[in-house]
Amino acid sequence: METTASVVAELNVALGTDYRLVRQLTGGLQSTAYELTGGVVLKWTGDPAWAPRVRRAAELVRRARAVGYPTPAWLAVGTTAAGSPYQLQEFVTGSAPTLDQALARQVIEICELQRDLLPEDHDVSWSGWSHGVVFDGWDGVWERVQRYDGEAAELLARYGALCRPYRDHELPHHDLVHGDLNMGNLLAADGRITGIVDIEAAGGGARAYDLVALAASAARDGADAGVDELFLEAALRANGRAAVAVCAAAGFASVAEFVHTRSEQSQDMVNHGGRRLLELLDA
């Protein structure tokens, strides 16, 4: 069975390097991050199915950084002999902030850099996934959450009603979408955003997806008052109400399922974020 130590040893052989493990970093949910010597961060996952997505994300990181999007540079991308994908990134100083309105406005400006970064068409985008989850039963997420007891299913029904007029609406596909943008994936130091991490799920879609996710995170994760509303207003300006509604609904369904087997507190926090977005959308 692979361990972080064995992955470091293997990539040292492959790359001709001498990295050593320093510590596990906090933040980020898609795969665990580790600081190595030499100002380098290792991220890896034991799921070989993630390898194509990681390789695709490497190109999107390059594009994003070229326009000033502050995600760390990727230094190397590869797979272990067992097929586990990994990437080496530059280490960026900072820690996950509690967002105030000044930092939130910085993040909104950063999200505007995502506009039209993927002019080419893609087989699957975050907009396509969101529409499919809400209207076409993709992955079975919507149906599973509908069967839950308690508030999550009630909120999902409200999201379904909110989205109903937009079934035939074409959502934007050409923005860069981070795909998991929340307060835990931001880094800040000295009053400024220094990094956006955990970007392996990046793809095309509507940048409103990320702004809506930030609004929900702000509501549930303790941001200053009004920050959630700033993000939602930015999402509406970016891509309009149809995209915001469908992205919010799909995002809520996905996160509600993610926390369903976790603590009651986690479920309550997710429900609070989902409820707050509905309130802001008058739905």
Residue spans for each PLM region:
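Active-site activation/catalytic loop segments of kinase-like enzymes and analogous catalytic loops
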Residues: 208-240, 249-267, 275-276
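ATP-binding glycine-rich loop module of kinase domains
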Residues: 30-53
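Catalytic-loop of the protein kinase fold
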Residues: 176-178, 183
